């Protein structure tokens, strides 16, 4: 099961900014079962992602989950009507109110069927809605390297579906060799995390994909998973949120 919960938040006690995104991760950890929170803390690939984005005058806090356990222990807890406000101790006990919630649910099988039945797209336009970055050879990468993008998306899709066929080096090589960025509009942005700043990038890239239809649809499927799991580092804390904005046949 893939889910998204959009929570529109306000506060009379302080001005909400994107810099509280990592603080909201702590709100989730406090709201869910403590044993499950400990498991997530030690997990390399978390079954959820978060983002905080301003839509017009509204701040939208999105929490997405993959898998039944995350659905039961994260999504259901936060989607419950009793979770209507919370306190940020790091902001002098400021109260944050949730004024509206929107929920979206789709079985993994339905996502796969819908994407693979689509007419193949040669160009995918991908928007990075919150700062994204990667780790490679113990260093940060702050540009959208397609090898790293596809690699992490394949690993996340594998973890989400428990299907090892989503990741193999031959398919990864085929994706990288048959894809290239043909246009982009990117900028570097700082992401606040526990008193320090991580440099990432936001904006969009258009990826041209050649080769067979199966490869094109597989690439689109990976980005569909990315819309729920994010891409790159710290996706559970608010980095790496992405969306497919449009595609061209």
Language-model features, listed with the residues they occupy:
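RNA-interacting cores
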Residues: 1-249
